Swiss-Prot record:
GO molecular function: mRNA binding; structural constituent of ribosome
Pfam short name (any one): Ribosomal_L12_N
Subunit text: Homodimer. Part of the ribosomal stalk of the 50S ribosomal subunit. Forms a multimeric L10(L12)X complex, where L10 forms an elongated spine to which 2 to 4 L12 dimers bind in a sequential fashion. Binds GTP-bound translation factors.
Protein name per UniProt: Large ribosomal subunit protein bL12
GO cellular component: cytosolic large ribosomal subunit
Gene expressing this chain: rplL
Organism, as annotated: Oenococcus oeni (strain ATCC BAA-331 / PSU-1)
Alphabetical keyword list: Ribonucleoprotein, Ribosomal protein
UniProt cross-references to InterPro entries, sorted A to Z: Ribosomal_bL12, Ribosomal_bL12_C, Ribosomal_bL12_C/ClpS-like, Ribosomal_bL12_oligo, Ribosomal_bL12_oligo_N_sf
NCBIfam families found in the cross-reference section: L12
Family: Belongs to the bacterial ribosomal protein bL12 family.
Length: 121
């Protein structure tokens, strides 16, 4: 049997809306498909991460080399020795807030190089 799309289109033009709805239902049943338009999930998790433009750098664990981490925190924040030590001892604690992605990753790298465990939030 040859497929004549022009004849099918001509038949569809002459059909009523009710006939076309029945045709769609029959095609769905016959082939196990749906004519409904797919709906995308709003606000997928990947989209939130991509849209984020400011990050908080959180020290989650100072690690074994606490003195090096205190120095890195002091350099990054401009805080005094006691304040920097208090931040490190109080881990988990936010070291800096609202940094752009590049600055946040730089600070994270410096803290990790000093031996700390760091998370970007």
């Amino acid at each position: 049997m040859a497929f004549d799309k022009d004849a099918i289109i001509a038949s569809l033009k002459e059909a009523s809306i009710l006939d076309l709805a029945d045709l769609v239902k029959a095609i769905e049943d016959e082939f196990g498909v749906s004519a409904a338009a797919p709906v995308a999930a709003a606000g997928a998790a990947g989209d939130d991460a991509a849209a984020k433009d400011s990050f908080d750098v959180e020290l989650t664990e100072p690690g074994q080399a606490k003195i090096g981490v205190i120095k890195a925190v002091r350099d990054a924040t401009g805080l005094g020795l006691k304040e920097s030590k208090d931040l490190v001892d109080g881990a988990p604690s936010v070291i800096k807030k609202d940094l752009n992605e590049s600055d946040a990753n730089d600070l994270k790298s410096k803290l990790e190089a000093a031996g700390a465990t760091v998370a970007l939030k």
